[in-house]
Amino acid sequence: MKLTPKELDKLMLHYAGELAKKRKERGIKLNYVEAVALISAHVMEEARAGKKSAAELMQEGRTLLKPDDVMDGVASMIHEVGIEAMFPDGTKLVTVHTPIESKGKLVPGELFLKNEDITINEGKQAISVKVKNVGDRPVQIGSHFHFFEVNRCLDFDREKAFGKRLDIASGTAVRFEPGEEKSVELIDIGGNRRIFGFNALVDRQADNESKKIALHRAKERGFHGAKSDDNYVKTIKE
């Protein structure tokens, strides 16, 4: 007997559903996987029998499990269950919406927020830097990018931006259109201040020595706004 991958998946789902059914009968509360398997296996079997329509199984799927049949939080995790089931007239997608009524006790990942504003980067001193995009393409900078190493076509005082990032909310960004000039607020990068990656201008601890090296590299590589001391002589291993 040879089975296709899809047939093997259905067979595995049947086994999982039967196991979940036995555990339910023994009074064991089902977890997320077991709950989905039980509902899916039941729908597949009833569809194969051919005595009920897809619409009837969509409704019946909502009656198989009660909140007390599953672990706390499981009901709120299952918004819908979709099963491709074989009916006498062909394969149909049966979607069971909200298959388990939620008691509203515990919702995994639920956030309880205070009814007040959140001050980002509180206690960090910010500096203002004027930046101009001298390139011909838009440039977008993320919140935690080392601002010293941003696109070479952004012209600003890079020395002031060493070891700093944008003073904006995490995950947001600032966009500079071609020819656009505007001021941005920068704050110190937190943590142990070991800066690696980005445009590989630092790749070490952010201190005064590494700033001189980084400025030298930036000037050599054509980053606008990078001014290096011509009298500063040091061997730099690239």
UniProtKB/Swiss-Prot annotation:
Its main location: cytoplasm. One of its GO terms (cellular component) is urease complex. SUPFAM superfamilies: Urease, beta-subunit, Urease, gamma-subunit. It is an enzyme of class 3 (hydrolase). GO terms for molecular function: nickel cation binding; urease activity. Keywords: Cytoplasm, Hydrolase. Pathway: Nitrogen metabolism; urea degradation; CO(2) and NH(3) from urea (urease route): step 1/1. Residues 1-102 are annotated as: Urease gamma. GO terms for biological process: urea catabolic process. It is found in: Cytoplasm. Pfam families: Urease_beta (PF00699), Urease_gamma (PF00547). Residues 103-238 are annotated as: Urease beta. Its EC number is 3.5.1.5. InterPro entries: Urease_beta-like, Urease_betasu_sf, Urease_gamma-beta_su, Urease_gamma/gamma-beta_su, Urease_gamma_sf, Urease_subunit. It catalyses: urea + 2 H2O + H(+) = hydrogencarbonate + 2 NH4(+). NCBIfam families: PRK13192.1, PRK13203.1, PRK13241.1, PRK13986.1, urease_beta, urease_gam. HAMAP family: Urease_beta, Urease_beta_gamma. Heterohexamer of 3 UreA (alpha) and 3 UreB (beta) subunits. In the N-terminal section; belongs to the urease gamma subunit family. This is Urease subunit alpha. The gene is ureA.
